[in-house]
């Protein structure tokens, strides 16, 4: 069976449809949703396969959208139609089976059983072995500047099937629709489709192999690459050499201003930076990543929205953001920050919303008294009355010892089934578990 026949097999296409549906995602330029995929393929599968086998299949232009990057700029994405997405996914599944055993052990992005945690473990291994000079490579607009002819040439080294190579080139040249205008694509691999990650890794695998042949220690995650050496002199020499190689061999431009040589404490890789304890190098989230988490929570807890929203909905939104952030950065050392800074700040903000939802001093008094009696907290009637009727603003009122103690972390974390309200995640407990 040829590669294109494997790609178009019933099993492979069905798996592709299943994955595209599971990933959901926005519609392409034809507005077809993922929910329409199965009925569409049931009706048109035969003609789609025939057009591909006859080299007559024409992928539609991708729809250009922009998403914010961590540095505040916008990242362009290209959203294929859902039918094109299925074909891309089917190709990607077979390419992964070919390339996974070929790819470098030091490439971590978009690969099975690899993620930022495995990448960071390797970085820490290098640092603790004494490779403490870091070359932080920045490839300018990598996905937008991949050379099509070079990529096809690299593909042909492992993919000996003209139909498959032809189909991949068609996807590369499908064009982009931006604000209703279609422009051709003669360069680049648009991010947003299932084929983009594997093609980007295939292209940069040549770079990985070059670094390996030189005996260099490196970690690459998609287009983010750090190289680790023992001295600043070696770092200068390696940076010049690999920059030249990338530009000559892969036609990629390395940013002269963003590519830098740093010590680990000044390094920023995948949202982490580094510090040295008595037991060795460790990683932690960058300060700006902590700041972005806090900004997201501030948006959820914006008073005019959060006060009018059911508390259960607010807790659900908060839990989703906090758990997702901690899951990503869990490998980093951040116990002290979560315990002493983030956790108390979060609960203070939540208490403000709860007390403001109670509105009237009498309601505040009644509710605090209920908690006081239910948990035998021991506050006097006068203490609770004083807090409920204070002239302090909401924020200062909810910072008092009485409110902090009564609306405790434990109380907030308990779900309320009657009101269909989940418990608020305790960030420290979630991080430590």
Where in the sequence are the language-model features?
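Non-catalytic, polymerase-adjacent accessory regions of viral genome-replication enzymes
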Residues: 1-42, 46
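Short acidic (Asp/Glu) and glycine-rich catalytic loops that position anionic groups and cofactors
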Residues: 23-29, 99-103, 131-133, 147-149, ...
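Conserved polymerase palm-domain catalytic core
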Residues: 51-66, 70, 102-266
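Conserved phosphate-binding loops in nucleotide/dinucleotide-binding enzymes
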Residues: 76-77, 81, 283
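Electropositive, glycine- and tryptophan-enriched low-complexity nucleic-acid-binding patches
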Residues: 88-108
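A conserved non-catalytic segment of reverse transcriptases
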Residues: 173, 249-313, 321-323
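Right-hand nucleic-acid polymerase module
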Residues: 300-364
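Extended C-terminal regions of large enzymes
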Residues: 358-433
